[in-house]
Amino acid sequence: MFYFYSEGKKLRLPIKQIIYAEILNHDLYITTNGWGTVHSRMTLAAFLEKMPDNFIRIHHSYVINTDYLMGVGYRECTVAGNVVLPVARGMQKTVEKYFM
């Protein structure tokens, strides 16, 4: 379980349902399988510290759960829901490794 605060409430979220997380204007948005998107005031680095090894940072603004990795292209990847996310140049090989 992942415990976090969102809009003044302490919430818990099953880690296996997290598809990806995005940082936008210093706010963390966590997209899930079944819960929609939830919001928290947390850094992406702090979020990643609490996640298991199958979560990787693919870009300055994104962390993905590799269990939901559906496809890899040049400097982008597709996760569940056909969401296309950017991949940093230096992370391309890492993402491809998890896809294989």
Features from the language model and the residues they span:
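Basic, polyanion-interacting recognition surfaces, primarily
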Residues: 1-100
